[in-house]
Amino acid sequence: MAFIGLAFTLSAQTLWADSNLKVSEIIRQDLRFCESTYPYDGGILVANFGSGQLDPLNAEGKGYINWYKNGKVSTLIPADGSLSAPKGMLVKDGYLYVCDVNRIVVFSLKERTARPRTISLPEGNLFVNDLVEWNGSLYASVTNTDRIFRLDISDPMNPGTPQEWVTVPGPNGLLLDNGVLYVASYPADGNTRDHHVVYRIADLEHPRPEKLFQTSGQYDGIAFSSDHKALYVSNWNPAGLIRIDLQTGQATPLVLDLETPLVGPADISVSEGKIYIPDLPNSRVLVVEESVQQQAAKGKNYRLSSHILDYYCPLNILS
């Protein structure tokens, strides 16, 4: 996710000069500063801060997790004080792991009344952002300290202690498949530098980050296309989405058909041919059809049909 203070400066920017950002539909539901999406049981989980103001370090205890499925929204994890600023999520062996400020909170999906467990990270590692798992090890990115931690979760009831695993500039979104980790880099201080790119780590036992995509940005969410031939990456500056071909390395801007500009695309996910893009400051989730056709006139741009899940926010700061 991006950090407080940046959202409003980006609101007037468009993705690319020829983008046509128009809203095709708005569905009002129950979201409040949604940062992350995650496929779950035929639907999508959405993590919300629920706070009075947009603050990724808030300690208000108003965070909650919604479950969107078949056009309906229900509450999976209520705002009961267990979460404050929930971000990246992971479901493994009947447990839901959720990033929060300086910690990871673990909920049992089988025993909903059970108290959640807390895995604390070392002091100062505040912006715990995203999670992936491989062979019983959980990997957690911390954007403000340039670290990715690893811990053993083979026994969910007795998780290991988080250990520093590798250093990557501003690690934000994580994506892991077949032992290869992809990392979206975001500048914690808001100042984009050459090393804020998309990285790949091909060997988890001997981690060595390599630049996969050279263009710097404020990258947040990262997800595979349904055919696993490309990556979708969200960017806060300029606000939008790009598609990176994993075979050629070519990056293509995706043209979203929106009327209200995308402001803060956070932790995206792909499920059943649709891309879910949480627009954090606007408290909404864009649902984008993944089927794209290359525009002959442009040669490099794609157009996406889309509709909006603009979840009800009574104090929407950008309304």
Named regions from a protein language model:
Residues K22-I27, K72-A79, A114-L121, N158-V166, ...:
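A short beta-strand motif characteristic of beta-propeller blades
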Residues D30, L45-A59, L96-R103, A140-D146, ...:
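Conserved beta-strand positions in repeat-built beta-propeller and related beta-rich domains
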Residues D30-D41, K62, D80-Y95, P122-N135, ...:
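Beta-rich, blade/repeat-based domains predominating
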Residues L57, G61-N66, R103-V105, R147-F149, ...:
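A short loop-to-beta-strand structural motif that recurs across blades of beta-propeller domains
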Residues Y68-K72, S108-T113, D152-M157, A202-H206, ...:
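Short loop/turn segments that connect beta-strands within beta-propeller blades
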Residues C99-L151:
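Hydrophobic alpha-helical segments and helix pairs
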Residues P265-Y312:
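Blade-level signature of beta-propeller repeat domains, shared across WD40, Kelch, NHL, RCC1
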